[in-house]
């Protein structure tokens, strides 16, 4: 044992040294906005072209790995926090794990590009400057994603997935499974499973061109040691040019490294990344003022290339993160594990708001400047043990989680005033149909960068769970709970929020046979309660207890060998802050109640024909609103019905050729709580093709996709009295070679 321990420590030191050595290759001067350059020795590439051999075509891989379902688009296993890794048929929750094959073949560049394959997910993203979505009708953002099950260390603003092998989507709250999300998302959890070196050496180069004028280069390299114990995976990524939105440009440079080391009794991984991302002239949402809401019933009809983001706006971010995770088997029935991660984010952003005031298109433009440094530290420690009792096997888990945020921030909302007098940045009037913009540099004046400590947040929790399975494996019961503590210090207000909450969960799954599983669960989600800030409220200054979202869910899963399908029905309630119209007392209320029915399917029913998709029926309502004014109204931003159908078809007459199609449909949705402005239903079609062949024994794949094929001009409903104009028809072309 001592020898193995020394060997493990030595290998970890070697792995960490490799990480430190590799990462500087992609370091750049992000803070100054300039990219560092490096002079490399001359690299000679020697190749030999075959004289008379024709190009050899190849078919899609015929067999899938055991962890991927038929068709290769969905992984069988998911990582579910205290439940560990489990097959989807053995999980009493609705979870989908999108594979790297789907990510590559759909040319997905962001997390949203992947998760919109699920109809339970609605896109709230604003062009290239934000990553946001709804899961089962509740909002979540990039800040609430996990990396290998750990909150707080994923890039805070950047949603790229160059280093990601799988994107796991848990639908529904998950307080027991992974703790409270940093920003309090309760509708579901997105978990990134990072890439690992595979058994065979990998060197993949991908060149892409698309959107307006966007050029991308991506290098993916993986190697394992001779004994297979140590693996290294490196991803280098560069992206620059015009996006799908008018005048918007992006410039991204990123590097990632993933290490793993395995022995007979231990498994250790380390992931690190550094990202520089700049977006100029971003597209923004259209907001509706109270006056406009009184006069409008739908968003205005505008040209598909209309622009609501002002010229001269920008967002510059630098993200650095690292995650170390390790497991050690004390014996065959007891394992200890731990994880440690950190992230540092620098952000410098100037954005604008475009507020429509009248049906004639009269609008107002205002600006906001924000620069911040965000630091996060996250950790987890625990043990899992197996105990066999008469008739029932127990899998016990005890874990403790810790996360600490520090935010240094300066935010200026224009107009800027000194001694009550407007100095610069006064709101100006324009038109939604023919917008005229002010010159930002002269209009706003110099932007002052300073980052005083603004606030801190600490999340601590302890979770205990017992997974009980009958000896025949037919019944599994999950019983557990998490004690969550929330401490928030607002430096500017000189206030402290400190509350705690116990969150229980119960679940069961019954395997009727190898093909059918029935399940049910009750689980909660947690979010920080708010402070009463209304000075007229009798309880001014009080801190509301943490908000508790509660979910009841029932479902069935069917594994038919080549096709799998899941059906689930759920009800989620989530409170908010409400003011009593008579007493003026502020309390937790204003409940949102979402009830839904989900149907998902995936697989390869016939060789060469692959399917993914599903349907979602949602009844999302406001309840317990102030004075009952909006009781029964539909929750804004959520369609009653959504559907996604993705099809891939191999053309057997042309080896290596595959045609693809995806249809996305959303029914109408409201943008305001009073339900007076409705966005029309919309359907979007995406078509594509890929061709796989060999050149001199080198596998090559050419992919071409057209998004929004029919150039559909449509609005996407958001919350907070806003809508977003989607991009018109765009394309993406790429060539990948595996050496």
Each predicted region: which residue ranges?
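Gram-negative outer-membrane beta-barrel transporters
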Residues: 471-474, 571-573, 588-673, 734-738
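Conserved C-terminal beta-signal and adjacent last beta-strands/turns
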Residues: 6-7, 372, 395-396, 520, ...
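Outer-membrane beta-barrel translocator/receptor signature
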Residues: 162-165, 175-255, 261-267, 320, ...
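Surface-exposed extracellular loop regions of Gram-negative outer-membrane beta-barrel proteins
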Residues: 278-291, 404-409, 509-553, 558, ...
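Structural signature of Gram-negative outer-membrane beta-barrels, strongest in the C-terminal barrel
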Residues: 374, 393-405, 451-574, 604-606, ...
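Acidic, small-polar-rich N-terminal luminal/periplasmic segments of exported/outer-membrane proteins
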Residues: 41-200, 554
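Acidic/polar loop-and-plug regions of large Gram-negative outer-membrane beta-barrel proteins
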Residues: 241-243, 258-329, 342-374, 419-450
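Membrane-embedded beta-barrel scaffold of Gram-negative outer-membrane proteins
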Residues: 327-329, 335-341, 345-351, 545-624, ...
């Amino acid at each position: 044992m001592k020898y193995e321990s020394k060997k493990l420590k030595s290998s970890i030191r070697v792995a960490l040294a490799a990480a430190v050595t590799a990462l500087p290759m992609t370091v750049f001067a992000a803070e100054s906005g300039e990219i560092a350059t490096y002079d490399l020795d001359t690299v000679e590439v020697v190749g030999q072209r075959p004289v008379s051999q024709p190009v050899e075509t190849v078919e899609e891989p015929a067999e899938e790995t055991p962890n991927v379902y038929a068709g290769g688009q969905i992984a069988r296993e998911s990582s579910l926090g205290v439940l560990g890794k489990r097959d989807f048929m053995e999980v009493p929750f609705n979870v989908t794990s999108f594979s790297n094959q789907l990510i590559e073949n759909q040319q997905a560049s962001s997390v949203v590009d992947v998760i919109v394959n699920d109809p339970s997910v609605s896109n709230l993203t604003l062009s290239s400057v934000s990553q946001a979505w709804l899961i089962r009708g509740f909002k979540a953002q990039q800040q609430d994603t996990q990396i290998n099950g750990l909150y707080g260390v994923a890039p805070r603003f950047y949603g790229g997935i160059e280093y990601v092998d799988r994107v796991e989507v848990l639908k529904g709250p998950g307080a027991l499974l992974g703790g409270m999300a940093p920003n309090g998302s309760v509708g579901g959890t997105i978990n990134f499973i990072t890439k690992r070196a595979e058994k065979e050496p990998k060197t993949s180069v991908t060149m892409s061109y698309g959107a307006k004028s966007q050029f991308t280069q991506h290098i993916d390299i993986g190697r394992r040691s001779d004994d297979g114990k140590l693996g290294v995976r490196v991803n280098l990524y560069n992206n620059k040019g015009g996006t799908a939105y008018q005048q918007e440009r992006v410039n991204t440079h990123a590097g990632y490294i993933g290490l793993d080391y395995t022995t007979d009794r231990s498994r250790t991984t380390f992931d690190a990344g550094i990202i520089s991302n700049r977006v100029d002239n971003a597209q923004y949402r259209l907001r509706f003022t109270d006056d406009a809401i009184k006069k409008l019933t739908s968003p205005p009809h505008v040209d598909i290339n209309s622009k609501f983001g002002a010229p001269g706006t920008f967002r510059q971010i630098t993200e650095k993160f690292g995650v170390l995770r390790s497991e050690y088997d004390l014996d065959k029935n007891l394992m200890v594990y731990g994880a440690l991660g950190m992230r540092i984010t620098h952000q410098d952003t100037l954005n604008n708001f475009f507020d429509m005031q009248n049906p004639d298109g009269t609008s107002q433009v205002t600006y906001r400047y924000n620069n911040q440094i965000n630091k996060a530290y996250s950790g987890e420690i625990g043990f899992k043990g197996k105990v066999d009792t008469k008739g029932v096997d127990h899998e016990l888990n005890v874990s403790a989680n810790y996360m600490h945020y520090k935010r240094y921030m300066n935010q200026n909302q224009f107009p800027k005033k000194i001694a009550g007098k407007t100095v610069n940045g006064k709101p100006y009037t324009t038109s939604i149909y023919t917008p005229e913009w002010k010159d930002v540099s002269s209009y706003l004046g110099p932007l002052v960068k300073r980052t005083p400590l603004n606030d801190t947040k600490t999340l601590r929790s302890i979770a205990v769970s017992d997974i009980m399975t009958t000896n025949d494996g037919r019944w599994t019961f999950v019983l557990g709970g998490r004690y969550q503590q929330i401490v928030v210090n607002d430096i500017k207000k000189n206030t402290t929020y400190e509350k705690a909450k116990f969150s229980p969960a119960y679940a069961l799954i019954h395997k009727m046979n190898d093909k059918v599983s029935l399940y049910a669960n009750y689980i909660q989600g947690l979010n920080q309660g708010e402070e009463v800030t209304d000075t007229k409220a009798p309880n001014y200054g009080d801190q509301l207890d943490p908000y508790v979202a509660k979910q009841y869910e029932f479902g069935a899963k069917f594994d038919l060998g080549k096709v799998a399908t899941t059906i689930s029905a759920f009800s989620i309630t989530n409170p908010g802050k409400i003011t009593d119209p008579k007493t003026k007392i502020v309390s937790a209320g204003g409940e949102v109640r979402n009830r839904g029915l989900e149907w998902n399917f995936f697989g390869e029913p016939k060789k060469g024909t692959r399917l993914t998709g599903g349907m979602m029926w949602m009844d999302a309502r406001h309840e317990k609103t102030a004075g009952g004014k909006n009781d029964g109204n539909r929750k804004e931003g959520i369609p009653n019905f959504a559907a996604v159908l993705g099809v891939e078809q191999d053309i057997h007459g042309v080896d290596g050729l595959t045609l693809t199609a995806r249809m996305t449909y959303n029914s109408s949705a409201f943008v305001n709580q009073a339900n007076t402005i409705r966005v029309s239903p919309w359907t979007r079609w995406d078509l594509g093709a890929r061709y796989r062949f060999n050149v001199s024994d080198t596998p090559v794949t050419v992919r071409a996709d057209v998004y929004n094929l029919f150039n559909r001009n449509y609005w996407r409903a958001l919350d907070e009295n806003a809508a977003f104009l989607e991009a018109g028809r765009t394309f993406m072309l790429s060539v990948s070679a595996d050496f």
